[in-house]
Amino acid sequence: MRVAVIGMGLIGGSVLRALAAAGHRVIGFDADPATRGTARTAAAEAPPSARWQIAPSVSAAVADAELCVIAVPLPALEIVLDEITGRGYRGLITDVTSVKMPVLDLVERYLEGGSQRLAGFVGGHPMAGRETSGFTAADPRLFDGCAWVLGLEPGRTMLGDWLDLAALVTELGARAVPATAAEHDRAVATISHVPHLVASAVAEQAADPLAAALGAGSFRDGTRVAATRPDLVAAMCGGNADAVRPVLDAVIESLTAARAALDARDPIAALRPWLVPGHRTRSTWPATAGEPLPMRPSIPALLDLGRAGGWITSVSTDRTTVTAVRPE
């Protein structure tokens, strides 16, 4: 497949490298000239069978592409879409943005009034972020075993487009997870965005030199994502504010209950029941995978699979069957 990757940070650069390693014809572009230079040098040093090209512009990158992967921050997405549609690109488009409703709302504007400036769009989000960033952090194995959400909107998403992307991401080692944009945003608020905020709040307390000197496993594991660039976290959480607010409120309410337990006559006894639900949930995560089974794909069946915590591991060449896994 001929693929254009627009934006070559950690995720975009990893997509670029992974697709090239899988034998696809890939061309990348980044607005930063230094990033383009670094990526061009890395391409020359890659094995001949896993090399990619670097384009001088968005238009040049998508000129011959069948698929365009947009891997830019949410605030830059509209600029890229304008350039792509202005070029007359008619291939499939996906993105890797960590929030999906704002992206879906933006894409809808390109489809209003029957203009069909976009031929096909399937939102995406590989759950493979790290605290490192930039093309130098890109890794072609980044997606091995990761959940890659692919947006599936009844009445909007073409099933064939979704299956084509599911086939591609599973080829890269990911698990394709079907979900609507709203379902995705609620879920990532819980398991990604609010944990970033909590980690930053805890990490701030280690400004004390003695506390920093004593930091070990609990501090390291509980604050790892606080090392993520603040502008990236702000874009993630602020872009998903509607979903983040109720989850953050629930966490604050829970911590307030823990604070009250510390004032009890017996704080140890008071804290114990507060700790049990979190311990139980974390001890059973991740869920044990069930047996992979063939499934006839349809939008309702795929969404039911995603809501049950399941995923797709492969797609047949003729797109008539997928291999589905549900948690036990």
Where are these regions (language model features)?
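Rossmann-like NAD(P)(H) cofactor-binding subdomain of soluble oxidoreductases
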Residues: 80-136
